[in-house]
């Protein structure tokens, strides 16, 4: 028998965090973060990481499990989630995967397999040096020549994954897209997949407001503190927003340019998330546009959970 799993996805700033806590409190769930950057300690403001006082007593997993200079791959994420789900179910709780990193979510719900491979840090450093020497877009163009499928999926600014894809190709001669396979016909869990959406103009306004709030909360100081302990080229420091603030601190961008770039790149990231999740045919979409939409969506998700698993009661057990 397949284990139960609720999957809650949506673009950045749509409101997944607060809604997921409300649902988890109602049905007795534990939340597994599906965000590839919230795994890193000390990267709190810029990743919109939930604060302990916001968790409402709901256990959260896969947050603050790595230092920023440590590697964290989708394969490791998949393995950790696969270990967590039976543990959560054994406690009589409902596992709920919440996030916006599409590949991470898909690796859990579909039958993805990954080719194990050691990291080549010298090769990665050389590739990053080539990008700095030749300018933005150089490595993406190289990737397009050897692995067009991955290049089409990755944004030219997603240097982390572009470097990883080129690393795999140089090590094996095989595109990384060919080493990741999925059987889409058979889900790995007895899942309920929910997608959150919102009017695009309202979402973009929320993104701009959230960036301003993060900066006012001390995001730049957070980046300064990280740079004291870690070099700017480590994987985590290439994350959205952190990279732009590092460029500002190095004098390569003005403050106004950095803020504008963060907002623009975050809006573009949200658009790519929409595109990715729209491909998931099993998602039930709920619109969060409007003042009462969030409460209605919470009630609807709770209803769907109890409809799918009728024995699911508050803090109860799925028999």
UniProtKB/Swiss-Prot annotation:
Site label Interaction with substrate tRNA, positions: 101, 124
Keyword tRNA processing: yes
Gene Ontology molecular functions: ATP binding; tRNA dimethylallyltransferase activity
Keywords: ATP-binding, Magnesium, Nucleotide-binding, Transferase, tRNA processing
EC id: 2.5.1.75
Annotated segments matching region Interaction with substrate tRNA: 35-38
Record field: catalytic activity: adenosine(37) in tRNA + dimethylallyl diphosphate = N(6)-dimethylallyladenosine(37) in tRNA + diphosphate
Positions in coiled-coil regions: none
Pfam families: IPPT
One GO biological process term: tRNA modification
Binding positions (substrate): 12-17
CC cofactor: Mg(2+)
Entry similarity comment: Belongs to the IPP transferase family.
NCBIfam families assigned: miaA
Subunit structure, interactors included: Monomer.
Protein name in UniProt: tRNA dimethylallyltransferase
The organism of origin for this protein: Symbiobacterium thermophilum (strain DSM 24528 / JCM 14929 / IAM 14863 / T)
Gene assigned in the entry: miaA
């Amino acid at each position: 028998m397949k284990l139960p799993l609720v999957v809650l996805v949506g673009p950045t700033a749509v409101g997944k965090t607060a809604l997921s806590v409300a649902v988890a409190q109602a049905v007795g769930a534990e939340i597994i973060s599906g965000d590839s950057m919230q795994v890193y300690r000390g990267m709190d403001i810029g990743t919109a990481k939930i604060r302990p006082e916001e968790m409402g007593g709901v256990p959260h997993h896969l947050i603050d499990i790595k230092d920023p200079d440590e590697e964290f791959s989708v394969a490791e994420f998949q393995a950790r989630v696969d270990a967590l789900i039976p543990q959560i179910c054994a406690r009589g709780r409902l596992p709920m995967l919440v996030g916006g990193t599409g590949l991470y979510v898909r690796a859990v719900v579909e039958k993805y397999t990954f080719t194990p491979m050691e990291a080549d840090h010298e090769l990665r450093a050389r590739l990053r040096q080539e990008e700095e020497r030749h300018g933005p877009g150089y490595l993406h163009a190289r990737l397009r020549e050897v692995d067009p499928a991955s290049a089409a999926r990755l944004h030219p600014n997603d240097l982390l994954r572009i470097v990883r894809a080129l690393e795999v190709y140089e090590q094996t001669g095989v595109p990384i897209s060919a080493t990741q396979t999925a059987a889409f016909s058979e889900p790995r869990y007895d899942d309920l997949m929910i997608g959150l959406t919102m009017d695009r103009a309202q979402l973009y306004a929320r993104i701009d407001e959230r960036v301003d709030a993060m900066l006012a909360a001390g995001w730049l100081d957070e980046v300064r503190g990280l740079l004291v302990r870690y070099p700017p080229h480590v994987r985590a420091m290439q994350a959205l927003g952190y990279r732009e603030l590092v460029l500002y601190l190095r004098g390569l961008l003005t403050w106004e340019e950095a803020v504008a770039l963060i907002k623009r790149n975050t809006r573009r990231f949200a658009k790519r998330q929409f595109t990715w999740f729209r491909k998931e045919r099993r998602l039930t979409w709920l619109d969060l546009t409007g003042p009462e939409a969030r409460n209605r969506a919470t009630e609807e998700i709770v209803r769907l959970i109890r409809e799918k698993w009728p024995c699911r009661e508050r803090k109860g057990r799925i028999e």
